[in-house]
């Protein structure tokens, strides 16, 4: 079948197309590539596994070489142990046999090979070998005789499949190029300090054409004009100075990148997925593991056959063809196990195996089918040639670490998910406060973190914003609820606490004080929340808390009170009613500004009336509240003095104040009547 070769030299990627499908990828990326020749230094010799580690310049991983791959050293002493062949700090000439994978370093060999277009030179090899794909016996005899004549002394030679039918001059010229290359490597090895890279196929286009070009290729597309010239030059040198007939060489000129235009990137994305759909409706699942690669075949939605036997046979044959292509595309190597759909007929099993073996012949890695097991599994092996597609284009998932799933253990769901604000109990939420403010209680010790809630209390400055008198929790309590609250609080003893009350800790430590527990004239004892029990590994299982209470010392804070400002406003009775009804302050009628509108005394007089300015302000007493909390917790003492209402709250003219003035006037009239009646009665008795 005709093939096309797409070369993206900029990205060092080439693809081989056949029947509008990518059959194979060639990627030349990575620090160590197959065929690289290094001058290495032996680091460690391990006689237990007959191997050694060689430093080839990689600071992270050393190369691995087995005793069977030592090459010229082993040829001299065949039966010797590796400790007699290698020693630490010894210089060795090695070639990369397998690229590094995962935590493993590159596999090295001492059997150096230099591949050419028609022959492969083996400097430390012996004899002459021919490719198995050359079928003609007369051609094999011709090439064998030619190789014996031109083979350098003391070296080996391998004749490739491309040499079939080629003239002798082209084969000899190819061998001479390889001999010059080997001489340059030897000279550089003598003058270079180890470890060092001595040789690499830097010409990506030459490498692709050497390994992939054949008589069945009818089109080559390159992404650069210089690459186009080099392709023509290489092909002319290999064809006696003439461009091969029937071959189209193109330069990609489209605006879209060459990898996107020919859907190479899309094919790579699909190849990284485990599922591959078949044309008939079935599909296969490819799962690589550390030990082997498992491939499962499923019929899927294929129901076009008349019988179940035909459906199974057709699906297995389609799967065999697709599996052979996926092995080349993904470059899967090692042990491979294929689970075809169960077939009862032995004849059908042999037919599928024959079809599978025929599809694998186009693979240059020479996969070998081992056997068909009793469970219906097909076992085969494939030689490793470079990194697979998962190592080249795949990265480990940061979420699962490559497992393919994340772990969710019992009881961890609640800890991972954030708690919605609507589900937080009301007793754990800080409630808003209103004016007036109490003196700030500042403690000398830092607040503790309660492990039961996983959060710490806020700083002490927030205590100054508490309004205990107007707190909603105290407004909702009637007399019965107050008695129940005192009863529950009294259950908290000195040596222990109730389990329920111990868990009901309020986020605000002042929330235990009720309206009747506050004494602004004297000391105020504030109860802190009880501590949670801590587990102990002793005999009793729980330990008594050594220190159950902590005394928090506070210093009294004296508020700075400024005398109120007195302002006189002239207003008619009608204006007073309108301002009171609409809630408008009389201060808007003043032309001068007021320093503090919240601390001012407004003297309202009628127009033309002489204002009477008060000379002294008598502070009103504040209701006293005596604390009666019996909780054995840290206490905070606060000292406060009564503050004039005029200094903390602005005077507001409302309808309520007018009614209070009317009530006061009526009360004074009744007192006068009582006095007058009492005086009349006394006069009557005297008479």
Curated annotation (Swiss-Prot):
Chief site of localization: cytoplasm
All residue ranges annotated as the S1 motif domain in the record: 35-117
Cofactor(s) required for function per UniProt: Mg(2+); Zn(2+)
Q: What is its EC number?
A: 3.1.26.12
Organism superkingdom = Bacteria
Instruction: Give the matching CDD domains.
Output: S1_RNase_E
Q: Which UniProt keywords apply?
A: Cytoplasm, Endonuclease, Hydrolase, Magnesium, Metal-binding, Nuclease, RNA-binding, rRNA processing, rRNA-binding, tRNA processing, tRNA-binding, Zinc
**Where is the motif named C4 Arg-rich motif, necessary and sufficient to confer PNPase binding on another protein mapped on this chain?**
670-678
Q: Where is this region: Disordered?
A: 650-687
Q: Which GO terms describe its cellular component?
A: cytoplasm
Q: Which residues bind Mg(2+)?
A: 296, 339
Q: Which GO terms describe its molecular function?
A: endonuclease activity; metal ion binding; RNA nuclease activity; rRNA binding; tRNA binding
The job of this chain, per UniProt, is described as: Endoribonuclease that plays a central role in rRNA and tRNA processing and mRNA decay. Has been shown to act on 9S rRNA (the precursor of 5S rRNA).
- Quaternary assembly: May form homodimers or higher order multimers. Interacts with polynucleotide phosphorylase (PNPase, pnp) via the C4 Arg-rich motif (residues 670-678). A homotetramer formed by a dimer of dimers.
Q: What family does the entry list? A: Belongs to the RNase E/G family.
Protein name stated in the entry: Ribonuclease E
Q: Which organism is it from?
A: Nostoc sp. (strain PCC 7120 / SAG 25.82 / UTEX 2576)
